[in-house]
Amino acid sequence: MAQYDPVLLSVDKHVALITVNDPDRRNAVTDEMSAQLRAAIQRAEGDPDVHAVVVTGAGKAFCAGADLSALGAGVGDPAEPRLLRLYDGFMAVSSCNLPTIAAVNGAAVGAGLNLALAADVRIAGPAALFDARFQKLGLHPGGGATWMLQRAVGPQVARAALLFGMCFDAESAVRHGLALMVADDPVTAALELAAGPAAAPREVVLASKATMRATASPGSLDLEQHELAKRLELGPQAKSVQSPEFAARLAAAQHR
């Protein structure tokens, strides 16, 4: 299997393009990838030349979720620290002070769906698939998924996804408000959309996003709501990770 830098970062015309880059494993989230994704977001935020961020996946998948071997590791050890490390990258996208776009080129599954949901806007490629899949694996949702999905599509569609296993292809994602549009080349479309903040004064872009966060739900910032959801989900997800049911489903998935 080829070796890759797990996260790539390039900057052009005031836009940072961040690519999760493990195509042989469908960009599954590992501790290393998660940490490098946070570092890439922080580099973009700290670069005065960057006005917006686009996140995408290398190869055919956007992000196939958490690395199953990482999820199943450390049997008997507390699961919470492992889960928090896997959350770290998409939480950095969620808290990014710059406008963010997820160019969803393929499957966004589990934690990969969280990565897409963490962005301000999602653009779907023709092969995009949005699939929570937590329940199918015997897992409780985590990383603020319950809050992010309800924010994006409302409570009924979010419950259809998380409780009933509903998935969304590119067209249905747009129909339900999960994605802004379908584009043959979602990265190109995302870069074109990002030309808006790229042409604006950076301080205005930063202030506009900060104000939208504050006014989305008066009385609290959306970041605070995401953190609360993450904390509420962490215990039940950790319990489910350590359950015999998850172990059996993990073993079955690894032997397919």
Curated annotation (Swiss-Prot):
Record-linked CDD domains: crotonase-like
A biological process term (GO) from this entry: fatty acid metabolic process
Catalytic activity reported: a (3S)-3-hydroxyacyl-CoA = a (2E)-enoyl-CoA + H2O; a 4-saturated-(3S)-3-hydroxyacyl-CoA = a (3E)-enoyl-CoA + H2O
Expression triggers: Induced in response to the thiol oxidant diamide.
Family: Belongs to the enoyl-CoA hydratase/isomerase family.
Gene designation: echA14
Region span, Disordered: 235-256
Organism: Mycobacterium bovis (strain ATCC BAA-935 / AF2122/97)
One MF term in the entry's GO annotations: enoyl-CoA hydratase activity
NCBIfam families linked: PRK05870.1
InterPro entries: ClpP/crotonase-like_dom_sf (IPR029045), Enoyl-CoA_hyd/isom_CS (IPR018376), Enoyl-CoA_hydra/iso (IPR001753)
UniProt function note: Could possibly oxidize fatty acids using specific components.
PROSITE patterns associated with the record: ENOYL_COA_HYDRATASE (PS00166)
Source organism phylogeny: Bacteria, Bacillati, Actinomycetota, Actinomycetes, Mycobacteriales
Protein name, as recorded: Probable enoyl-CoA hydratase echA14
Keywords from the named record: Fatty acid metabolism, Lipid metabolism, Lyase
The EC number(s) this enzyme carries: 4.2.1.17
